[in-house]
Amino acid sequence: MKGLFSAAALSLAVGQASAHYIFQQLSINGNQFPVYQYIRKNTNYNSPVTDLTSDDLRCNVGAQGAGTDTVTVKAGDQFTFTLDTPVYHQGPISIYMSKAPGAASDYDGSGGWFKIKDWGPTFNADGTATWDMAGSYTYNIPTCIPDGDYLLRIQSLAIHNPWPAGIPQFYISCAQITVTGGGNGNPGPTALIPGAFKDTDPGYTVNIYTNFHNYTVPGPEVFSCNGGGSNPPPPVSSSTPATTTLVTSTRTTSSTSSASTPASTGGCTVAKWGQCGGNGYTGCTTCAAGSTCSKQNDYYSQCL
């Protein structure tokens, strides 16, 4: 019995590890720093945030400035966010910044956020779309923003389980930075988080498996020091489809005792590997035939 329990626990751990991820390491100009030295450490392991009204959408569950160092960077410096494992779920990657009124370590992110970068889908000539599902993401601090302390936020919006049967997942981390050598730009437009994302946004509700021909990343327009303007959605390729690298993982499952399945909501079902429960979760709770809603932690239950 003990052996069976251990095997079941290992199976769940493998399933969770292969499906979830966290941005945990920051690099500046190629210099990689220790895990969580400059990134606020969350308390929900690598689980996502799904509640659009939660303050956890800012920097993740339990992520605090206290105990996190703040790194000094120059405007224009290159930065990289590295994950514990490559992004596993389809969806856009976005980077935001919010200027702290004082020290970044004391800032709760309740002010305005402006977006500096989106990675959206590439639509190929064969009618498919590919996403940049990488193990790290690199961009540059805008050269024109004012000096001072900022929160630098990266977000993966996973839309692999189409709404409303499924619910999109936000994988988030915030780094604390002090910008020097900047300018007198006025970054914007800005949006509050929570509030920047709505369950009516086409980029939130889209079904990426059916008639998926265009996409707009949720959130405000991307800020540019060259007078603003967003990065437009990638156009449909008229020639050779884009080349992508497929990240594969092996999932192992076995029969196991699972958490009680919550009451069904409206007769909808969640596909295998999708989220079916957890603190703050308001989506569908009934798993598709052949899978069972299993509690991974207080924040996430998954159809296995």
UniProtKB/Swiss-Prot annotation:
One protein family per Pfam: CBM_1
Binding site for O2: 160, 169
Compositional bias annotation for Low complexity: 237-265
Residues with attached carbohydrate: 214
Domain CBM1, chain residue ranges per copy: 268-304
Presence of keyword Oxidoreductase: yes
One Gene Ontology term, aspect cellular component: extracellular region
Name assigned to this protein: AA9 family lytic polysaccharide monooxygenase G
Organism: Thermothielavioides terrestris (strain ATCC 38088 / NRRL 8126) (Thielavia terrestris)
